[in-house]
Curated annotation (Swiss-Prot):
Acidic residues: compositionally biased ranges: 30-44
Keyword Secreted: yes
Chief localization: secreted
Tissue: Expressed by the skin glands.
Primary role: Has antibacterial activity.
Keyword Secreted (UniProt): yes
Family, similarity comment: Belongs to the frog skin active peptide (FSAP) family. Dermaseptin subfamily.
Name of this chain's protein: Raniseptin-7
Chain segments carrying region Disordered: 27-46
GO CC entries: extracellular region
């Protein structure tokens, strides 16, 4: 009978230990997934910021080009 008690306690102990290890791994997995989602959100925000910056630079380039064209035409055609 004592042998069965010891065996039963050993099985229960090992089951509890393995269960706690599984729970810990599950929590770590959830934390990693959450962190990956945050990284994806950050990268999406960075992409939006870069697109906005490129749009501003594009607009600025158009304005500078028009000004340069106007100055060049003014100096090439000084009749006015």
């Amino acid at each position: 009978m004592a042998f069965l008690k010891k065996s039963l306690f050993l099985v229960l102990f090992l089951g509890i230990v393995s269960l706690s290890i599984c729970e810990e791994e599950k929590r770590e997995g959830e934390e990693e997934e959450k962190q990956e989602e945050e990284n994806e959100e950050l990268s999406e925000e960075e992409l939006r910021e870069r697109r906005a910056l490129l749009d501003k630079l594009k607009s600025l380039g158009k304005v500078v080009g028009k000004v340069a064209l106007g100055v060049a035409q003014h100096y090439l055609n000084p009749q006015q």
